[in-house]
Amino acid sequence: MSLTRLLIKDFRNIENADLALSPGFNFLVGANGSGKTSVLEAIYTLGHGRAFRSLQPGRVIRHEQEAFVLHGRLQGEERETSIGLTKDKQGDSKVRIDGTDGHKIAELAHLMPMQLITPEGFTLLNGGPKYRRAFLDWGCFHNEAGFFTAWSNLKRLLKQRNAALRQVSRYEQLRPWDKELIPLAEQISTWRAEYSIAIAQDMADTCQQFLPEFSLTFSFQRGWEKETDYADVLERSFERDRMLTYTAHGPHKADFRIRADGAPVEDTLSRGQLKLLMCALRLAQGEFLTRESGRRCLYLIDDFASELDDARRGLLASRLKATQSQVFVSVISAEHVIDMSDENSKMFTVEKGKITD
């Protein structure tokens, strides 16, 4: 499915924009601060309900306006789908799909699977475990129908359990929460483990093409001891959890560790190599989704040229083309993407929030 049309109103520095898009490559060219990243962010927000540069809705609404409006048309193999998102300064959202209101953000995310590659995306590799959990959870969300509901319930129960830890004196008082929490935690951990195994070969093959000089390994850690029932862990950790006032073990502490030649990648790879690895992982994840479900990702790439030399840019471009997916690329100069452009591409110039093609 590709985004054939995008309407933006009062988002960041963009007052109004109506863009007819290519199902292939779409290039956004402009100086720093011109608004090219804002276009990528509008697409991301349309599919996620939040921006990738700010979690506060008021910061992405254009100055002195009350709300932003985003609208898109998605073209699938058999039908077109109309989607829309409005969000005000208080953070209240309205999702519209095919002209009807009352839909959930998760429905947009399902309709628009996308991979985001930004200069800040190194956090996948050198940031905390939450970024790598999010990587696995993206895959589980798009591959397991029940994942989002289970994940939402897990978050709710953990919040309630942590609040209860401040009030209880005996473990038996926590059992009502743990009775619900334990099967959810085990199911989510099983899904994550199965996904990490299923995608391992895709990641290894893509990383070998991008970084043949390294031997990369991937390992999923579920957030509590191996071969130990989660129920036993919770009961045994009660006194410590009560002192900490939070649950110290569980799927919310899981990690997906990546090593190069036996050492953490953040200690071994250069910034250019880390960017290649990040791109390889995102590509592998998108290609796995296509093979398993027949659905294609949208790829959003901010500041395409940064950290990469000509040869590496060429390698990334050729792999992106091979996906036959829709790709949005922001660059400062068109010279950086001239070799990627073809008769099906579209080139947009962005200047002070105004977009022309």
Swiss-Prot record:
Keywords carried by this UniProt record: ATP-binding, Cytoplasm, DNA damage, DNA repair, DNA replication, DNA-binding, Nucleotide-binding, SOS response
Q: Give disulfide pairs as residue numbers.
A: none
Q: Where in the cell is it found?
A: Cytoplasm
GO MF annotations, alphabetized? ATP binding; single-stranded DNA binding
| Record-linked Gene3D superfamilies | P-loop containing nucleotide triphosphate hydrolases, RecF/RecN/SMC, N-terminal domain
Keyword Cytoplasm belongs to the record: yes
Q: Which Pfam families match?
A: SMC_N
- Matching PROSITE patterns: RECF_1, RECF_2
Q: Which residues bind ATP?
A: 30-37
Where it mainly occurs, coarsely classed, is cytoplasm
Stated family: Belongs to the RecF family.
Outline what the protein does: The RecF protein is involved in DNA metabolism; it is required for DNA replication and normal SOS inducibility. RecF binds preferentially to single-stranded, linear DNA. It also seems to bind ATP.
- The entry's protein name is DNA replication and repair protein RecF
What is the phylogenetic placement of the source species in the record?
Bacteria, Pseudomonadati, Pseudomonadota, Gammaproteobacteria, Enterobacterales
